[in-house]
Structure formats: structure tokens, C-alpha cells
Amino acid sequence: MSTADFVFIESKDPIFLDLQAFCTALREKFPGILIIERTNPEKAYSLSWDYQIPQLTLESSLSSKKNVFVIDYFDSTNRLQDYASYIIWLRKWFPPEEKVSFCDEGYEYVFELPSDLSQKELENYLRTRFDE
């Protein structure tokens, strides 16, 4: 992937996302991950993480308002399946009843991510968007 993708919640209410629980889950899912937390409220992103192993490389961040996950880079051996799994995993951090979407940097491709979306459904969407 050469451009960023986003998983975002469409809510006007403040978002509660337990950063400690999220960081713990990141460390469990991706052992050895590098997590950088920023405490400056003027920064656009409060958290960023990088992970690199031979089978998977990813770079992501969380907006300071905790309403947008940014996927700056993602590549893996099983890219389509792994990317769909990662997007669904990020979606689970937002309340299931809220409208959450996935889009590209240019907001050209927007795909709703209902909480009960299957990985196979997301893979089918991604297949239409990315060349394998």
C-alpha cells in the first residue's frame, strides 16, 4: 500500500478508548511492537505503532480525538487476509452500535464496517480495490 487508509467512527460524541487496554492488546497481538505515545494535545496523533517481522510490516496511528485509526503502511505474506483481519480488529475498538467506516486517503473509496461484518465480506471488498 502506498497511501494511507483510515478506520473511523462517525460520531459527534467524545470517543472513549482505553489506551492502556489498547496498547496491551497491541503487544499481545504483535509481540515486540514499537508503540509511541504522545502526550502533547496539539499533536494530530496520540499514539503510533510500528511492527516488522519477515511475514508482516505495519505502521499505524490513532488520532488525538481517538476517532480515527490511520493505517500508513501494511504488507504481509497473506496481504488480503491479514489486512482484512487487521481492519476488523481495529473496528472492534469502537462501540458496535456506532457507524464506522473504512476509507482511503483521498476519500475515494468508502466502505461501511458494521460490527458484524465478516472477514470474508471485507476481503471481497478489498479484492475489488487492490490488485493482488
Residue ranges with predicted function:
Residues 9, 15, 33-36, 53, ...:
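Weak global preference for isoleucine
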Residues 50-132:
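Charged interaction segments
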